[in-house]
Regions:
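Hydrophobic N-terminal alpha-helices or hydrophobic patches in metabolic proteins across all domains
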Residues: 2-210
Length: 210
């Protein structure tokens, strides 16, 4: 008769004996979340600086609609060529977007990555955060476009020059970038970068056959 496997065999690294590896992982994620959210909040100006650079390139197809993209802390300001009124010299419209609203998936990804305790976790963390930057930029730009094309009023919206179908697309992009991408995309990126960990977790939690 074959000898039984040693206790804890097949469990992911760091999983304690006598406790479900999945339960331990979930608990570790919960413990990491406050830490990663605090760090994310503190370093958000640096993260938004990267988003600002990407956004400045991404708005180029809109021509002279956006004159420049500026930053104050974690808030990005899109300085446009649109006039707030009909009077000459009345200034231009500037739209502020809070980048924190679209980047809170980053600390979630960090908590999952650090809880998995993979040997290359710091490399995976950097890769994952970098992969999330374009999606954060998408949400920020969709918010900006929603403001100038829909919520800014007919005078400003008419200057922006978007058609009715384009405004519908902007509204959809805004909803998608606000409700779906900040939570779903980090989870997808984590799954893609941690397939080996998930395979080990599945093997460790599989019920042995009789």
């Amino acid at each position: 008769m074959d000898a039984p496997p040693p206790p804890g065999a097949g469990t992911p690294a760091g999983a304690p004996r006598g406790r479900s590896p999945l339960a331990r992982f979930v608990l570790t994620v919960i413990l990491w979340l406050p830490v990663t959210f605090v760090v994310w909040y503190l370093v958000s100006p640096a993260l938004m600086w990267v988003v600002k650079l990407v956004a400045a390139v991404a708005v180029m197809p809109f021509g002279d609609l956006v004159r420049t993209v500026e930053q104050t802390g974690s808030t990005l300001q899109f300085v446009t060529s649109l006039k707030p009124g009909q009077a000459a010299g009345a200034g231009v419209v500037s739209v502020s977007v809070d980048g924190l609203l679209y980047s809170f998936g980053m600390p979630m990804f960090a908590a999952l990555t650090l809880s998995a305790r993979e040997q290359a976790r710091w490399k995976l963390l950097v890769i994952g955060i970098a992969a999330l930057v374009p999606f954060v930029t998408f949400g920020v730009i969709a918010d900006f476009l929603k403001n100038v094309a829909i919520t800014a009023g007919p005078l400003v919206a008419s200057q922006a020059g978007f058609s009715a179908p384009q405004r519908e697309m902007i509204a959809f992009a805004y909803q998608f970038g606000t409700l779906i991408m900040p939570t779903v995309v980090p989870a997808v990126v984590w799954v893609v970068t941690h397939r080996a960990f998930l395979e080990r977790m599945r093997g460790a939690t599989r019920t042995p056959s009789a």
